[in-house]
């Protein structure tokens, strides 16, 4: 089977599974980390317009080859933000006011921003605590340049994703009472995107279900 046929078959399967559970529009972000730009070109050929990267260097390189909506979803380092904001149009992982202050200074174009919320308080994995979330939201929503889209989260290691997304839905509903315009939810990966959608996810970040397994060292 050719690489085009393999990706096409996987992509159609994912799209069908999204359609089976979605009662609202869902943006499929194809996560291309560790995969070559040639795979991104195939995805574009198949109608994919949104691509996700966790690493600045990979995103910078591939975005030069394939135009589209590029999403950065990795943990943010301040010294990488000038580069990240040069190629990404969406950031899914803002969890620190200091990072937003840097974004305000270095971003060459308006960004769509999701705030990453931690569901278990393990901040080394990324994510602001619920108590910090509103302060961060006030900061971003007050920007005249950038757009606060909503929330992003990843289920804690070892937990039931369905329970995690149920918890996230409660946090989101409370958040939207304060910030009704920030109604987007970035949640769900290859193993659990249907559950995330059933709990309200508007953006799912799917890699291996479309492009195949990554090698263990990656």
Give the location of each predicted region.
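Conserved alpha/beta-domain cores
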Residues: 1-191, 197-199, 211
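Expand to "…catalyze enediolate/carbanion chemistry for C-C bond making/breaking, isomerization
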Residues: 197, 206, 210-217
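Conserved, well-ordered active-site substructure
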Residues: 203
